Each structure stands twice: as structure tokens, then as C-alpha cells.
């Protein structure tokens, strides 16, 4: 009987934790969302990630099955070394992630981000660039390719031109400039996002992830 009671209490606690965490993501403002992401990255970089696993994660999956309320949109590179959910130490349902090579934005990508803002009530967009981005490296080196890859490189070229002659590493300079440029374009090219940014309802930030340290830097 005692063992059975312990199991019931344990399951109840797991359900409570998962339900509470799902609710925490809903309706938080941009500044609080950004703080939560940066604190998560600090834990990740220090090897102290704390998001739920096993039973709590399973229960959270059930809780989120019918509705999602992500607290941030992350537009990041497709690079396998930069998974946003791990980098920000978040769990199921916390962030709405859109990934493309070099964070390149087209109509489909923009529509995906607009969906999160318009229909999911998300107030923060993070454009997440990263150290040693292969797409930016190819654009800087003037690489040519086949298929649709040249379209990706073409989209990054403005950042390459913008940073030519600057001191420092040309690839790193272009990576940072590309993220800043994309953040600006997201605001100016979307009739859904622009008025919300102007009113202060939505915030867009550019950020840079270091592969060497695991740390994220906000870009000015």
C-alpha cells in the first residue's frame, strides 16, 4: 500500500510540474522571454541544463498535445551544432523554431514567423547567428554551387559587401552583419510584424552563438 501511495504522489507531482511549466510559456512579454533565453544559455554553457526529462517530459508532451504557447520565435541557421532547444535549455512548447542555412528569409520563412506572432501570441523574435557559419563562409569566399544553393549565398552577399575592409575576421564580421540585417528586414518587410514592433508589443533581437564557448552574445 505504501509503495502504491508513493507512486500516485510521484505521478501527481510530475503532472503538476509539466502543467505548470506549460503555463509559464504563455503570454510573457518580450523582455522576460529574452531573459529566460539568456539564462537558459548560461546554464547550457556551464553544463547545468535543467529542463525536464523522462516522466516529466512525457507528461509535458501530453499537456501540449492540443495547444502551443511558445514564448519566443527563434530564426536560426540549420547548422547541426546549434540546436536552439538545447542552446537555450528549453523544453517542448517553449520556442517556435524556424531554421534555414544562414538564417536566410524567404516568403515561406517570413510567413512562418508571422504565424507565431499573429496566431500564437509570441512577443519576441531572435535571429540567431553562429560562429563559423558555413553558408556565410561560402558567400565570403565567393563559392559557386549548383541547385538552389546560390540563392542562399546571394541572400547573404549584402552582409559580405557591408563588412568588406573591416578589421577582424571577415567571416565573423559577415556573420554578425547578416544577423543584424535580417532582424531589420523582418521588421520592415512584414505588415504583421512592423506595427507590433513600433507599438512595443514585439521585440526583434539579433544574437551570436559561439561554438567555442556555448555562450550567446546580443548584437547591437
Located regions from the model:
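Short glycine-enriched loops at secondary-structure junctions
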Residues: 76-81, 101-104, 130
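Portal/gating segments that form or line small-molecule/metal binding sites
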Residues: 85
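Short helix-loop-beta junction
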Residues: 89-97
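Conserved functional hotspot residues or short segments at active or partner-binding sites
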Residues: 127
